[in-house]
Amino acid sequence: MAVKASERVKRYQNPNGPTISTVERKVIEQDGLYFKDIDGTGTVSAVNDWRLTPAERAEAYVKVLTTSEKIGQIFTSDWRMGPKYPSPRLAANGHKPVADESGLLDEAPVNVSDSIFGSQSLPSTSDMVKKSFNRHVILRESPTPEDLADYLNQLQYLTETCDHFVPMQVMSNSRNENGEVVFGMNDATGVFATYPGTLGIAAAVKGTARIDIIDKFADTIRREWNACGLKKGYMYMADCVTDPRWQRTFGTFGEDPELIEEIFDHLIPGIQGGSNGVTPEGVSVTVKHFPGGGARENGFDPHYAAGQWNIYATPGSLQKYHIPAFRAAIRHNAESIMPYYSKPCAEKSAPQEDFNGNPIALNPYGFAYNKVFIDGMLRSQMGFKGYINSDTGIVHNMCWGVDMLDEPERIGYAVTQSGVDLISGLLDNELGEESYARATNGYYDTHEVPAGFKKEDLVLTDESLNRAVSRTLTELFRQGMFEDPYADPKKAAEVVATKADWEEAARVHRESVVLLKNDGTLPLKKGCKVYAEAFGKSAEASGAATKALREMLGDVVLVDDPAAAEIALLMVSPQSGAYFNATPGYLELDICEDKTVCNVDESGKPTAETHKETTLVGANRIPGIAEAVHAHGGKVVSNINCPLAWEVGSIEKVSDALTVGFDTYPSATLDVIFGRFAPVGKLPLTLPKGDEVLAVNADGVCVSPNDVPGYAKDAYMPDSMKDENGKAYAYRDAAGNYYEMNFGLNY
């Protein structure tokens, strides 16, 4: 096996300048300074001269690169590692990795045919780098820090061997929060310093009033990723949750637009290394999903036709709730912003205004194809200077509003007309070449221009191609990747193992626990008799979680019969639907088992047909457990994991004490329950009262508006649903407390 690139790196230190690292690329020495021969000229050209600004160097380089090389740089898609870390998704399709000489890269081509994002054929890694000149890929695997650094170094070495050197920008979804690893959402858990879910981070910030939680979180991400050579994150979600049935609630910071904006005021400079764009020691962020994905029509996900619309049913909701965090992204110069798949619905929306006080034209195009929002609002009015990175799959399956265009036209329309700079979910240079060729080959002399479109907007042009590539090159120059793309695997392992970072993350886990109810039950005492059981979406998962829970309870007497227990300790982890899988009805938020619910038709309206929903296996047993414990004066202590805003009534009614967490470690929850850590967390979103406040009528209209956060929904709900305090939406417990945003008890 050949020597890994990591073992062959040579470094040249400039006095008062960047380190130059290379394996084989020529290094130019001039006037006591070192320069890398990026463009292959062998001179200190504008491209090679690190003393010029990143923008100046990028502008010079687009004049050197060939058209084919530039087309390869407007696409990004998932990429795989070598045989040591095979992709489970690709393995299910029969793909068998073939190692390169280093053992790190996969040289076997692959056909992706079962993806919701669309089908595509992907070449070997060498062909992707050398022939296609693709320079943006998305990494989903979860290697060790050392292996990650080795893999990234090997990719960078391949890019060095091309005539024109452009380093590889390897992107990843977030890797520093706990939770089930979900394709396309978070790409690792437990490898890097691991915080609770983003909702839990928000709960901790609210409860402690300490925004420095975000500062430390961001700094940890920056140091860990940078040490590994991972320089770009598809993170974080600036979306404000306004419909609780949105599956992606679990990746947000909740429903408080002011807090979300404040979080991004700290998150972006902390990760990128400053507020003036990414630094060589920083990691670029892609803030998503402009102009806010929370305004879901009855929670439907835009990966599917029923969820293709953003509905703004209340006047001014776009500006008031959904835009604020993106202002922070622009203030602090986030390197890129990702528009959402969905498109605005004028027919079902109230008037919305732009930043000049003028009505916004809610043209029915997906936001990546929507010039009004991207070029008009985001760039011209809000002043965004970075690049636009589309969400995954907009050219294939999620092409809402432009489905009448063919794929080359969608590429041209996104890049040339609306201003997208990087198209995600596609590595297909042939489609890009076709879109470019149509600008000059007379294609539309023999083919009809689709109605409502102009032919010049449907093709890639030199102007739009240069603009897009110049923006992504500028980011790479800012990151210092042209000069020093290689990471030190040993240092990567040391940085990720920093004890203080893991301890800080563990503390935030404890701070994320929210105490909702306590009839003098908590904290529990040592030595009490405890019946402990965990409940999940499957019997297998519940059994494994119960075993792990009982092993954590060393200070109590465990009993197997609830009737013999002083305390029943129930850890409840519901799950509704599955990400990237459409549900036959509305996303179920009741904690239930075999519940009969309505189906929906293709337009999202309820039908007379029904199906069964289970969000918690064993939910129907919980009242019996509680009854057995209560029969002799015992108490029930329950904890609910809340990646979604569950309807918690069925659990609260039988519980004497109730806590919630947000992908919070069970050990942290037990610290609160047993008094080892006093509860401080506050709810980052409102928990709905029940099905009645999420009811959808025959026309598909929800009784609580889809575009308004839970804390503000009461103003728009029928008076007949409101109680003596004028409240209708939030759950109210036996003690009279409303489980609204910002609620949380202490002992």
Residue locations for each model-derived region?
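N-terminal hydrophobic targeting/anchoring segments and the immediately downstream early-domain regions
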Residues: 1-203, 212-215, 221, 226, ...
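C-terminal non-catalytic regions of proteins with extracellular/luminal or membrane-system context
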Residues: 1-32, 38, 92-122, 208, ...
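Hydrophobic faces of well-ordered beta-strands that scaffold small-molecule active sites
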Residues: 75-77, 135-139, 168-174, 232-235, ...
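Glycine-rich tight-turn/loop motif centered on a GG-T
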Residues: 137-142, 187-212, 244-263, 300-320, ...
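Second-shell residues forming the walls of enzyme active-site clefts
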Residues: 154-164, 255-467, 471
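A short helix->loop->beta-strand "cap" motif at the edges of active sites that frequently abuts
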Residues: 166, 383-386, 420, 629-636, ...
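Short, conserved phosphate-binding/catalytic loop or strand-edge motifs used
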Residues: 172, 237-248, 489
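Helix-enriched interaction subdomains in cytosolic or periplasmic regions
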Residues: 463-514
